[in-house]
Amino acid sequence: MATEGLAGALATVLGGKGLLVQSCDSEPAGKPLLPVRLRKNVCYVVLAVFLNEQDEVLMIQEAKRECRGTWYLPAGRMEPGETIVEAMQREVKEEAGLLCEPVTLLSVEERGASWIRFVFLARPTGGVLKTSKNADSESLQAGWYPRVSLPTPLRAHDVVHLVELGAKFCQQATHPLILPQELPCNMVCQRLVATFTTVQSVWVLVGTVGTPHLPITACGFTPMEQRGGIKVAILRLLQECLTLHSLAVETKGLLGLQHLGRDHVDGICLNVLVTVAFRNPGIQDEPPKIRGENYFWWKVLEEDLQKQLLHRLQESSVVPLTR
């Protein structure tokens, strides 16, 4: 991929779109990566936040024995063969009785590569709100409740933060509307837009094996990588080409993600914005030195791409990636 190709790839990722994953630049040491399979070695969860014009939140009352009678947002596990959006729509229909469409991803939460939750802001498009007369094993009922007075008892208090995240986004969008892109991937991995900036310039880390490309790091399933979360895979790749003890690395968040749960391909690629900076910057006009020949710093000269990158960095205009 020449400079023109890199510019096109960066523009695609900044626009929330996806690129096919054909190989990865960094893998965990030891055993080869196993194919990712729902219900076997990964669990993906979907959750939806609905807010209406009366500042009310759609809540469902749980039917499961361990949390029966408590209240939560519509949520549940993805099933094999589903897209992420299809899973969210199915859970909302089963638990609340409503048809819906996603507005944007609000956040992505992870506990390592084996457990990832996708939080959507969504809007109803039809259906009939579930009442206690229609109680079943999915939920007892659903209802709209004032955002400042959610029904109790709550199944878990993380919903309070998620509702507020949705309300803030409705008041003022903190990132572009971003939805999962339907592209297959056979592993859980991250495509890095790893940046180094000075007052006037922006550099992006590029992998050189094969055609120059935005580097991809595979997430492992070892106990260490699970404990450390998916940021371990980012640090592993950067450690392979940079002297990290003199650098500060920050994961800003997601520019997008891609998944297509067809033909037993359950992997996910997260497109992640990362900053690399010197711990003691002083006057630094050049990015940190690269070790080896598998990577280089690409100086972004396209004015529009420069502006987009700087805006996304300065405003943290990304989907939060939390642990």
Swiss-Prot record:
Keyword annotations for this protein, in alphabetical order, are: Hydrolase, Magnesium, Manganese, Metal-binding, Nucleotide metabolism
Catalysed reaction equations from the record:
8-oxo-dGDP + H2O = 8-oxo-dGMP + phosphate + H(+); 8-oxo-dADP + H2O = 8-oxo-dAMP + phosphate + H(+); 2-oxo-dADP + H2O = 2-oxo-dAMP + phosphate + H(+); 8-oxo-GDP + H2O = 8-oxo-GMP + phosphate + H(+)
Would the keyword Phosphoprotein turn up in this protein's UniProt record? no
Q: Where is this motif: Nudix box?
A: 76-97
GO MF annotation list: 8-hydroxy-dADP phosphatase activity; 8-oxo-dGDP phosphatase activity; 8-oxo-GDP phosphatase activity; metal ion binding
InterPro entries attached here?
A: Nudix_hydrolase, NUDIX_hydrolase-like_dom_sf, NUDIX_hydrolase_CS, NUDIX_hydrolase_dom, NUDT18_NUDIX
Q: Which cofactor does it need?
A: Mn(2+); Mg(2+)
Which SUPFAM superfamilies would you find in this protein's record? Nudix (SSF55811)
EC number per UniProt: 3.6.1.58
Positions binding Mg(2+) in this chain are 58
Q: Which family does it belong to?
A: Belongs to the Nudix hydrolase family.
Summarizing the function annotation, the protein's role is: Mediates the hydrolysis of oxidized nucleoside diphosphate derivatives. Hydrolyzes 8-oxo-7,8-dihydroguanine (8-oxo-Gua)-containing deoxyribo- and ribonucleoside diphosphates to the monophosphates. Hydrolyzes 8-oxo-dGDP and 8-oxo-GDP with the same efficiencies. Also hydrolyzes 8-OH-dADP and 2-OH-dADP. Exhibited no or minimal hydrolysis activity against 8-oxo-dGTP, 8-oxo-GTP, dGTP, GTP, dGDP and GDP. Probably removes oxidized guanine nucleotides from both the DNA and RNA precursor pools.
**What's this protein's name?**
8-oxo-dGDP phosphatase NUDT18
What species is this protein from?
Rattus norvegicus (Rat)
> Which gene is transcribed and translated to give this protein?
Nudt18
